[in-house]
Amino acid sequence: MSLGLVGRKVGMTRIFTAEGDSIPVTVLDVSDNRVTQIKTVETDGYTAVQVAFGSRRASRVTKPLAGHLAKAGVEAGEILKEFRIDAAKAAELSNGAVVGADLFEVGQKVDVQGVSIGKGYAGTIKRYNFSSGRATHGNSRSHNVPGSIGMAQDPGRVFPGKRMTGHMGDVTVTVQNLEIARIDAERKLLLVKGAIPGAKGGKVFVTPAVKTKGAK
């Protein structure tokens, strides 16, 4: 249960260490994370912080949501995201507060969640890294087929979960234990070592890693 940030994937680049080593990084824009609501055990049954990210035209905001945001005194955002946190951390925040890149520190491990790039309808070779059939030696019209998908009369069906052709990508993916290589507090950017899911401009959620010893 840790507070995180909503961000936008700007793209990838590289940075250099003092020793001259090249490090591939993904640039995330985490500006304007605004607190819209603080939930407590007394009022909601659990403790959490709701933040808004981005901007949205007033004509595109429903009346209930507009009232909710007006109560907090916060501009409408493109995304509303809720983070479960403990009561002590929630007490340090207030409606309208801005959570910035200084929430994290260089070298910290984080988990980044996003929606992967859609690949459309794909075969088993592309989707699951199956091997193709032989190109010659009697093989005809069976070069890229997946092979048998079932059995005989018993059990007489295809087992659920069988890896077959189908839609690839466009699913929620979480990459764990990525390292924050650099923080640009002035431009409100996080530079995360390695690649993260999604295309340029995609929305991501950055939270402290949960499976690393000493994660903050």
Curated annotation (Swiss-Prot):
Residues with the N5-methylglutamine modification: Q153
Gene3D superfamilies: 3.30.160.810, Translation factors
Comp. bias intervals (Polar residues): 133-145
Gene Ontology CC terms: cytosolic large ribosomal subunit
InterPro entries: Ribosomal_uL3, Ribosomal_uL3_bac/org-type, Ribosomal_uL3_CS, Transl_B-barrel_sf
Keyword annotations of the record: Methylation, Ribonucleoprotein, Ribosomal protein, RNA-binding, rRNA-binding
Cited PROSITE patterns: RIBOSOMAL_L3 (PS00474)
Membrane-traversing stretches: none
GO molecular function, one term: rRNA binding
An annotated GO BP: translation
Pfam families, alphabetized: Ribosomal_L3
Post-translational modification: Methylated by PrmB.
Segments of this protein annotated with the region Disordered: 133-153
Family per similarity comment: Belongs to the universal ribosomal protein uL3 family.
Subunit structure: Part of the 50S ribosomal subunit. Forms a cluster with proteins L14 and L19.
HAMAP family linked: Ribosomal_uL3_B
Stated role: One of the primary rRNA binding proteins, it binds directly near the 3'-end of the 23S rRNA, where it nucleates assembly of the 50S subunit.
Protein name: Large ribosomal subunit protein uL3
Species the sequence originates in: Burkholderia orbicola (strain MC0-3)
Gene: rplC
